[in-house]
């Protein structure tokens, strides 16, 4: 499904060369309504039954639809969120209706990271592209696990953020909601089962500090229209 990042150097990211330019890995995301939360938690329960070392959804693993993941300097966070707020003022995200088309997975760190694949509607793509343009002047490269919450960010997680542009953006953007992790054979069977598509709404928008497996681990900013 195009969910695995291609390790290509982003053309529009600057390198961070000084210790004063501390980087943070951020996720500019949409927050789903209760319909999605209920569906996501139901799948997560099944995943954790199969893989007890997995994580449960909640405040430190918030279900979401990513618009953009980037490394930025900590000192630029206020400017970044102001730029994103300007995009949302002209392109309101709250109330958008989105459709889940399928369940899929990718292998990261030896486990199957499981997701709902979300339809790329014109409104969603417009938000994605405008947020990229707004954040581009502040995007940095060279982030390490120190840029994430905790100290366990694996190479796949770091690479995903580093190479989100161009490997996971524009025509390669796969909108999704991450549901948790489990053993591949279990998730492969889930994927093969009949799937009932469903719609859900966007109730909010925020910026989070990323954790391992691309989880939304700590809220940094909440959009207030």
Regions found by a protein language model. Give the residues of each.
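Bacterial N-terminal signal peptides
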Residues: 1-6
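Basic, often amphipathic N-terminal segments
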Residues: 10-107, 121-206, 210-225
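Acidic/polar active-site rim loop that often engages polyanionic ligands
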Residues: 108-112
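Surface-exposed, active-site-proximal loop segments in enzymatic domains
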Residues: 115
